[in-house]
Amino acid sequence: MNIYSIIPLLSENENEIIEDIAAQHAGGVADCFLFSMTLAPKGTPPLDLAGGLCARYRRFKAALDARRIPNGVLIQASIGHEYYQNSTRDFQHFVNLTDGQTTNTRCPLDEAFLSYIERAAAAIAGEHPSLVMLDDDFRLMAARRGKACACPLHMKALNALLDAD
């Protein structure tokens, strides 16, 4: 069995965080420590969030690798959550099926969004973490208000499957 501990990727108190992780590891609290990276796009054009987060992770990784403490990344809020307020207009947003309201979540069918998240994932992979865990952002049906995405991209895909216009 593996036990993971999720660590906020903070830039302050790095030494204290590293010592706390080392104590948790030595005490058997967890055997791998995952640093949380929130990648919900922000800004227009979208900011390179992964680049800055990877630079911060790199410092923790070097210190933990030197102590042979397994560490990795939790990719959090990659398509966004309704409560994140940001101004990205470059991507198709989730459109609620039930009421047609646009949310602050990105549609995973959007090629531009896929390119953004692919670059972010490549940056994270380039750091060679022991493990990468993906948050459950892709629960596009039951757990989201509106029950499903009815954006133009999803409607086009659905119509193609149904051979309809």
Model-identified regions with their sequence ranges:
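Catalytic domains of carbohydrate-active enzymes, especially glycoside hydrolases
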Residues: E14-K42, A123-L131
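Aromatic-lined substrate-binding rim segments of carbohydrate-active enzymes
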Residues: T38-D90
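The substrate-binding groove and active-site-proximal loops of carbohydrate-active enzymes
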Residues: N2-E12, L39-C54, D99-E118
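Active-site-adjacent "subsite" loops/lids of carbohydrate-active enzymes
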Residues: G72-E127, D136, L140-D165
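Active-site beta-loop-alpha junctions enriched in small/polar residues
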Residues: I7-S11, M37-A40, Q76-G80, D137-R139
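Hydrophobic faces of well-ordered beta-strands that scaffold small-molecule active sites
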Residues: N2-I6, C32-F35, N71-I75, V132-L134
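Alpha-helical scaffolding segments of alpha/beta enzyme cores, especially the outer helices
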Residues: E19, A23, A55-A66, S115, ...
